[in-house]
Regions:
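Flexible "stalk/tail and boundary" regions
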Residues: 23-24, 38, 68-86, 100-111, ...
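Surface-exposed loop and turn segments in beta-propeller and other repeat-based domains
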Residues: 82-96, 132-159, 194-212, 255
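Residue position within the beta-strands of beta-propeller blades
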Residues: 59-62, 113-114, 176-178, 229-232, ...
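Post-signal peptide N-terminal segment of mature Sec-exported envelope proteins
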Residues: 28-52, 73
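Short, solvent-exposed loop/turn segments at conserved positions within beta-propeller repeat blades
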Residues: 64-69, 116-117, 180-181, 236-242, ...
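Bacterial N-terminal signal peptides that target proteins for export
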Residues: 1-8
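Bacterial Sec-dependent N-terminal signal peptides
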Residues: 2, 13-38
């Protein structure tokens, strides 16, 4: 018995040492491990937000073509795509782009889905859904009007606009929403009551002759167990190197976690509980430059680029220790990054 116990103890120690070496390799900021992006799923119509469930299924929002054809699909571990919920509001924005669904989260068999066009939070019980089942129309889902509360709220800097974009669960079961239109974080209590946790400040205008501050445009939110981390896009003209990650306390106090980014569109927590952010693209003379998206790991002292060359990525979700899923809005794909 003692020999068997000793062998098991030795095996546990070896596994622990191997795990530590893997962590050390991953967290080497001076020489981060090389990672690549591979095609995981294709043929999606404007894929944006991602959520991974305990079975390894990937739930993804598709903005659609602007003709009320937004949908939520599920991707099985072998990369097959199945529609789950269809007919979400989708319109053509003043910029000529399709707009509608934002991000989603999965919790205990329920999807929480945001739509910035109709200003609603949708709740879908997918606990019994099996890939291949007939999809449901969005009109059958329970929904809650969030935008009316946001637009009526007397913000100190009031845009009089709402664009529900990203969300995350926080302490006490609250759901926290990054509103890219109002530049704010909205709290929805477990009973559905709404309040404002924090307003996300703009930045000084760095352009010649620019006087009005540039909006923060919060695009991503995560809770690391102590505080919220919020990624920002920054408004037009999307100045290079001016986007930030803000940290927001549970009481709503806002401060800069790290700056020096460009056009951030999503944020995830890495295996060390530090933020990994997604750059949409670098601004160019003709707008955002294709294939200039990147993934960056950030600490309070350093930003480390993990991968470049992504084509207009929009969402990121962690899959495993050093593996992520990323959507490509332009290519209609979900990529596996590892």
């Amino acid at each position: 018995m003692r020999t068997k116990s000793s062998a098991l103890l030795l095996l546990a120690v070896l596994l622990l040492l191997g795990s530590c070496r893997e962590h050390d390799k991953y967290f080497d900021e001076a020489k981060p491990p090389a990672i690549t992006a591979k095609e995981f799923a294709t043929g999606l119509a404007g894929p944006l937000g991602l959520a991974v469930d305990p079975k390894g299924h990937v739930w993804v929002t598709e903005v659609g073509t602007g003709h009320n054809d937004g949908k939520v699909s599920v991707i099985t571990p072998n990369g097959k795509v199945y529609p789950v919920i269809t007919q979400f509001a989708s319109v053509i924005s003043p910029e000529g782009l399709a707009a509608g669904l934002g991000h989603l989260v999965y919790k205990d068999g329920v999807l929480y889905i945001l739509n910035g066009v109709d200003g609603k939070l949708y709740l879908a019980d997918v606990s019994s859904f099996k890939p291949g089942d007939a999809p449901r129309p969005a009109s059958e889902l329970r929904s809650e009007d969030i935008a009316t509360f946001v637009i009526a709220y007397p913000f100190e800097v009031d845009t009089e606009f709402s664009n529900l974009y990203n969300l995350a669960f926080g302490p006490d079961g609250g759901l926290y929403i990054a509103d890219a239109g109002a530049n704010a974080v909205i709290r929805r209590s477990p009973s559905g009551q709404l309040s404002v946790l924090a307003a996300i400040p703009g930045i000084p205008n760095p352009t010649p002759g620019g006087t009005a501050p540039i909006d923060a445009v919060p695009t991503g939110i995560v809770y690391d167990g102590e505080k919220f981390l919020v990624s920002t896009l920054t408004g037009f003209p999307f100045p290079e190197g001016k986007a930030r990650i803000y940290q927001v306390s549970k009481e709503g106090l806002v401060s800069v976690y790290r700056d020096g980014f460009t056009a951030l569109v999503d944020i995830a927590l890495g295996p060390d509980n530090r933020p990994v952010v997604l750059q949409f693209a670098a601004p160019g003379p003709q707008g955002f430059a294709p294939s200039s998206g990147r993934i960056t790991r950030s600490t309070t002292s350093q930003n480390t680029v993990l991968l470049e060359g992504l084509n207009l990525p929009a969402g990121i979700a962690r899959r495993s220790l050093r593996s992520y899923y990323v959507t490509s809005l332009a290519d209609g794909k979900v990529l596996r990054v590892e």
